[in-house]
């Protein structure tokens, strides 16, 4: 609801016959408002700022004539016209001359009611519904100012804190004056010190944790700005647009880098020799030289220079130790002796040959416990050994054969005339015994033959 006029919906008393359908106002106050007591009991919703504005106005005030009221816009806030009668209305507003006693009496009643309301501070004076030319009361607030000569009163203070805070943030971020961030803010129409407000514009601090450059204190920035003002630069730097916001990815979401950090670069640009604005860079660590590329041709004949030291070469492998000969049953061919002309002689039998083995050696083997050795019988035909690799392998010689052989030997020594053929070894092979028996019959008187057979049978 604007303070330009009082709408009909703000006056809580029903209007009797004050307004006709054609929008013309009547000059009879008694038919419009009723009696004086009924008007004083009503409540008028008028802003107090308008009252203060009318109290302080020193110019003479007079009431304006009442124009036509549009019935189609009762809730818009501007109920009464400001430029006189509406072009739709053909009849001019009725004006009551001040010489009439009845009209003057009713005007005094209405003005006294407005005086009491203004003195009590409930509401301020507004253009009344009566078309009055002049005011005879000495109280200044009884009549409002002329609308054509006076501007509208200021807008009321908004009670919505969100709008105030939004305006402050927009003004703070879009300010082109960099000194405005460092010095005290110029007081504006808004009151920041009123308790209960939600604006924290004047009590904020700049957080330098989200800036990419080294930290600059507010005192240093203010001193630098003062120096710039005292000694102006003959070549002023080009203006930089501070309206561009930079998003800080390192800080929390929604944090923006304020343009105050650019002040240091602007202030120190006058003296290019100063190193204060340059960030401190630590000294570079010297990069060690690359190691020499190892030579992969060192074992070939291409390497003829001494460019590579001994440190680059791998350690020499000592010569391998000769493998010790193992006692395995199947030795490697390298361990066998080499033969002349590379020809291996024919294989030899591991059995003791009667030609090269004496009787003492055989007895020694038997006494050492070699009686369990198998009985080997060579193959002899016509008194000759047929093969040196093939022989008869007989079962072990039983121990009782030694007793028989001893008995025959003693009998032969006692009576050398009686020729007793010693019994051959009791072998399990029938063919061998048959052959021995036939040979004994064929050569009964041959002593050498018996001796040979004895050696052969009992080696």
UniProtKB/Swiss-Prot annotation:
Residue ranges, compositional bias (Polar residues): 264-273, 324-335
GO biological process terms, semicolon-separated: apoptotic process; bile acid biosynthetic process; cartilage development; cell migration; cellular hyperosmotic response; cellular response to dexamethasone stimulus; cellular response to epidermal growth factor stimulus; cellular response to insulin stimulus
Compositional bias ranges of the Basic and acidic residues kind: 310-323
Stretches the record annotates as Interaction with EGFR and ERBB2 and regulation of EGFR activation: 332-361
Principal subcellular localization: cytoplasm
Disordered: region residues: 227-352
Cytoplasm among keywords: yes
Biased composition (Pro residues): 282-291
Modified residues (Phosphothreonine): 126, 130
Domain observations: The EGFR-binding region prevents binding of a cyclin-like activator to the EGFR kinase domain, and thereby keeps EGFR in an inactive conformation. Also maintains EGFR in an inactive conformation by preventing formation of an asymmetric homodimer.
Its job: Negative regulator of EGFR signaling in skin morphogenesis. Acts as a negative regulator for several EGFR family members, including ERBB2, ERBB3 and ERBB4. Inhibits EGFR catalytic activity by interfering with its dimerization. Inhibits autophosphorylation of EGFR, ERBB2 and ERBB4. Important for normal keratinocyte proliferation and differentiation. Plays a role in modulating the response to steroid hormones in the uterus. Required for normal response to progesterone in the uterus and for fertility. Mediates epithelial estrogen responses in the uterus by regulating ESR1 levels and activation.
Record key words, sorted: Acetylation, Cell membrane, Cytoplasm, Membrane, Nucleus, Phosphoprotein, Tumor suppressor
Name of the protein described by the UniProt record: ERBB receptor feedback inhibitor 1
Pfam families referenced in this protein's UniProt entry, alphabetically: GTPase_binding (PF09027), Inhibitor_Mig-6 (PF11555)
Homology family: Belongs to the MIG6 family.
An example molecular function term from Gene Ontology annotations: small GTPase binding
Membrane topology note: Peripheral membrane protein
Subunit structure: Interacts with EGFR and ERBB2.
Subcellular location: Cytoplasm; Cell membrane; Nucleus
Modification sites for Phosphoserine: 250, 271, 300, 458
Modified residues annotated as N-acetylserine in this record: 2
Matching InterPro entries: Cdc42-bd-like, EGFR_SigReg_Kinase, Mig-6
Induction: By cAMP, glucocorticoids, phorbol esters and insulin.
């Amino acid at each position: 609801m604007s303070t330009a006029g009082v709408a009909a919906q703000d006056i809580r008393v029903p209007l009797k016959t004050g307004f006709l359908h054609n929008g013309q106002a009547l000059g009879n106050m008694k038919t419009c408002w009723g009696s004086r007591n009924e008007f004083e009991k009503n409540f008028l919703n008028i802003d107090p700022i308008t009252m203060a504005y009318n109290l302080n106005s020193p110019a003479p005030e007079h009431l304006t004539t009442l124009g036509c009221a549009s019935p189609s816009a009762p809730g818009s806030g501007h109920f009464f016209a400001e430029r006189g009668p509406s072009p739709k209305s053909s009849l001019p507003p009725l004006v009551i001359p001040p010489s009439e006693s009845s009209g003057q009496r009713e005007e005094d009643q209405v003005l006294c009611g407005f005086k009491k309301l203004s003195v009590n501070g409930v509401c301020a004076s507004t253009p009344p519904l009566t078309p009055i030319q002049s005011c005879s009361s000495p109280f200044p607030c009884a009549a409002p100012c002329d609308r054509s000569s006076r501007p509208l009163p200021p807008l009321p203070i908004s009670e919505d804190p969100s709008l105030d805070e939004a305006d402050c943030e927009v003004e703070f971020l879009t300010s082109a004056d960099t000194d405005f961030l460092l010095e005290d803010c110029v007081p504006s129409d808004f009151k920041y010190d009123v308790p209960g407000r939600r604006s924290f514009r004047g009590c904020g601090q700049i957080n330098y944790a989200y800036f990419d450059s080294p930290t600059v204190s507010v005192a240093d920035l203010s001193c630098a700005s003062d120096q710039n003002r005292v000694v102006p630069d003959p070549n002023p730097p080009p203006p930089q647009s501070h309206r561009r916001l930079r998003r800080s990815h390192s800080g929390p979401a929604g944090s923006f880098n304020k343009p105050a950090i650019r002040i240091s670069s602007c202030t120190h640009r006058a003296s290019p020799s100063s190193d204060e604005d340059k960030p401190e860079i630590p000294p570079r660590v010297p990069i060690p030289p690359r190691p020499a590329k190892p030579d992969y041709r060192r074992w070939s004949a291409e390497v003829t220079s001494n460019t590579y030291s001994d440190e680059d070469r791998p350690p020499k492998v000592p010569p391998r130790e000769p493998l010790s000969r193992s006692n395995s049953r199947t030795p490697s061919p390298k361990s066998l002796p080499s033969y002349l002309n590379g020809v291996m002689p024919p294989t030899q039998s591991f059995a003791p040959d009667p030609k090269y083995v004496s009787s003492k050696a055989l007895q020694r083997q038997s006494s050492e416990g070699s009686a369990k050795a198998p009985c080997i019988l060579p193959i002899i035909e016509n008194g000759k050994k047929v093969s040196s690799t093939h022989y008869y392998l007989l079962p072990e010689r039983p121990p009782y054969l030694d007793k028989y052989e001893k008995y025959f030997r003693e009998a032969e020594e006692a009576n050398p005339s009686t020729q007793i053929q010693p019994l051959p070894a009791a072998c399990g092979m029938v063919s061998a015994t048959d052959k021995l028996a036939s040979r004994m019959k064929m050569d009964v008187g041959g002593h050498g033959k018996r001796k040979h057979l004895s050696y052969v049978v009992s080696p």
